[in-house]
């Protein structure tokens, strides 16, 4: 987190990943602060990933792999959902990505679903406590265990819990955004995952 905006492109994990992968790969970044997996935000317009994923993917087609890391913003108290319902939303979004006609040479889809780092319990004493509302840590902490079985057996879907990657943690500044070091740790984990079968 930075107080006057976002990290620069070369500091965020997609472009760090690009630097690790090298010139044989092209990473397209589509991050948006506040985006949800499936919820329309009554306060901030245009945040529903389910409504946007088709045109986003088609704008970058043809694609070999799609990565999805959402869920943090779905934990906001105003959506009144628990971890199971948030996981259901991510699973629904994943299925829509699989069905989008964006894949190179009509190849089999390859979607890597990433569970984001868990919001720390201290977030409710920090700068986003009013924006997020109560109970976010608990909801966020439960996503991985509920999402994994929902995705198991889906052809073309891989699962990665960022919380299993050393250093991929939320910042003590706000308890919910990653530090530069965490972005690099996540990029390194994604590099290992994406190149393991190459």
What do the PLM-derived regions correspond to, one by one?
Residues 23, 47-198:
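Alpha-helical cap/lid subdomain in secreted, periplasmic
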Residues 1-32, 38-43, 55-58, 66, ...:
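Serine-esterase "nucleophile elbow" of acetyl-processing enzymes
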